[in-house]
Amino acid sequence: MDRLLNIGFIKIGYWELLDGQLHYIMTESFNDVCNNLYAFICDGEVKYIGKTTRLLKKRMYHYKKPGMSQSTNIKNNAYIREALLQNIAVDILVLPDNGLMHYGQFHLNLAAGLEDSIIKTINPEWNGGSKDLTDQSQIEADLNTNTFDDKFQHEFLKFESKDHCFNMA
């Protein structure tokens, strides 16, 4: 957790069970902030890292009441409930985007830029070992296990075998 605090994450709330229902309590000033990187922390251990471009309160609502097809929300709802039932506090930390970072005229979404790196470095349990989709070894493994259909793989290898190698990802 200290690594997150050192880069600017702040505690803004926590999860609780009231009459068997999951609820989140957050500092009002962060309810209506967009482009956030957030974390769920149990006993000082980072359990989950996520990002949202939506309002933070709306993102938390989907963990509170996940839809039937929202597998990440369903899993995290269960993890949060399990921790709370074991009397383990689940805190909510956030790294808000102040909107000041730009590359030329383009706004840089800090949450989008940091999420994969933080997950890869910290490897939070509830993230389920997310992998970097740009990892060349994973791309090669996918090619070797025929995850692409034969036609695409043939075209990919045809491009790769010429004098130039093109990244088709």
What residues fall within each predicted segment?
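Boundary/linker segments flanking structured domains
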Residues: 1-35, 42-47, 53-169
